[in-house]
Regions:
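The Walker A/P-loop phosphate-binding site
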Residues: 1-58, 245-247
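A conditional alpha-helix N-cap/helix-loop micro-motif detector
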Residues: 14-15, 74, 100, 137
Length: 247
């Protein structure tokens, strides 16, 4: 199994990106294990429901509305959840153990118990590494890579970009925070930067099995269940609109 990293600064959409990838795996009827170290099971589920309702429901259920418990049709929402059971053969398992209580051994136990097709870790530096220096983080990254290889399951983990990358148009694998070993261990590193309210710019910063350096754009409107690739021209139009609306 491969070890992938999705990296960005704080508040740039890492969790949304991981959830979008997890939902794509659900569409393929896969069993997904999602280790949520920062948010609760309910918060992760509501984000998933926003994406899923964009495909399986006439009404898109916005995440903020679900979290606040208002401004949506409760009967329609319950019907949507019931119908999901018939439309999806995949399983979505969320482990929302509090930060610091998750370790590589506990993730291994979850893998053995649930036999997932793919694992997501949100996010890497919240795992109990047994220390707070770069050596401990390097050891942790190596253990996560080892889990992917031992169980032959892909593992995708969110990670932070360090402060040196601030102002960089799109950071590379060398800008991963905590330890250079994370980028060295990873088979694939995707870095991302939010260009405006609705546009995220992404870069394949490292790909062990082929060419890297590719750049693409996503339209990011999670409350309406939209997270889709757009052309560079369309991305620029959205950026201009967002900046105009902000002025």
């Amino acid at each position: 199994g491969d070890y992938w990293i999705v990296a960005a600064r704080l508040g740039q959409g890492k969790t949304w990106t991981l959830i979008r990838m997890a939902v794509a795996a659900l569409y393929a009827d896969s069993t997904v294990l999602y280790c949520a170290l920062e948010q609760s099971r309910a918060q992760i589920a509501m984000r998933c429901h926003s994406f899923l309702s964009g495909k399986y429901s006439k009404q898109v259920f916005k995440t903020l509305d679900l979290m606040h418990g208002k401004d949506f049709d409760l009967v329609a929402y319950r019907q949507f959840l019931q119908e999901l059971k018939d439309k999806l053969d995949g399983r979505f398992i969320v482990n929302d153990t509090s930060r610091g209580r998750v370790s590589p051994s506990s993730i291994a136990a979850q893998i053995e118990r649930n036999r997932p097709d793919i694992v997501f870790i949100d996010y890497l530096t919240l795992i109990n590494s047994g220390g707070d220096d770069w050596r401990a983080m390097a050891d942790l990254s190596g253990e996560i890579k080892g889990l992917a290889m031992r169980y032959e399951v892909p593992i995708v983990a969110a990670a932070q970009i360090n402060r040196m990358a601030i102002g960089n148009d799109l950071p590379g694998a060398e800008h991963l925070a905590a330890s250079d070993a994370i980028g060295q261990d990873a088979d694939c590193v995707i870095t991302m930067r939010q260009m405006s309210q609705r546009v995220i710019k992404m870069k394949l910063a490292k790909f062990r099995h082929g060419m890297d350096g590719q750049i693409w754009f996503n339209e990011f409107a999670p409350n309406s269940g939209r997270f889709e690739e757009v052309s560079g021209d369309n991305a620029q139009d959205l950026i201009d609109e967002d900046r105009s609306n902000a002025d």
